[in-house]
Amino acid sequence: MAKSPTPNILICSFFFLIAVLSLPVDQTLATDTRPDSWAFLGGYGQSYPGWGQTTQRVETIDLIPRYNHIVFDEMGSGWYKGFHSTFFEFPVSLILNPEISTMIGINFLAAYTFTVNEKWQPYIFGGGGPVYIFADIPGMGTKLNGNYQFGIGLEYFLNKQNHLLFEYRYHHISNAGTAEPNEPLNSSKFIIGITF
């Protein structure tokens, strides 16, 4: 039975949207007055057999250095006032199950932060990138895969430079049909971090 092209179309459309949102724009539309920042995040993730075509339970401890570049500052008004930024992440994950191993990657994520409240600022984000898995996970046809993810976060301001970050992410890893088998890992990740 032939595979439906729908997942590939959705993935391509998603990355096209991220690319368009990351393009530079005329400076008269928005000014970049906020400073860029670094953050260090860590957390726990787990895939769920039966969620989509996922068949393996994979558990990870994630360490994520992140660079946050402000693209558009002071957009919108009212409850949706905020800014658009791009996250560049370099995740390293310790795989705990089904075997002890690691995976590494690079993520390019577009984000929108709502700034109505000065102390608590929710944000949404999405994107993806390549990921290399050192573990032999049944159902994964290749070591080099791609990921896409989206999530929600909450930023709490400790002071001008240091902010606490709390995130939930849906995280998908697969080889996009480049090899068989291609059983994806659909995971939830709970992440906390701090900016500096």
Regions found by a protein language model. Give the residues of each.
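Outer-membrane beta-barrel "beta-signal"
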Residues: 63-65, 183-196
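Transmembrane beta-barrel strands of outer-membrane/channel proteins
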Residues: 36-46, 88-92, 124-130, 166-170
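Cleavable N-terminal export/targeting peptides
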Residues: 1-33
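Sequence/structural signature of outer-membrane beta-barrel proteins
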Residues: 45-51, 74, 91-97, 130-137, ...
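Surface-exposed strand-loop-strand hairpins of Gram-negative outer-membrane beta-barrel proteins
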Residues: 46-62
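Short loop/turn motifs that connect adjacent beta-strands in outer-membrane beta-barrel proteins
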Residues: 25-36, 71-84, 98-100, 116-121, ...
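Residue-level signature of outer-membrane beta-barrel architecture
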Residues: 69, 112-114, 154-156, 194-196
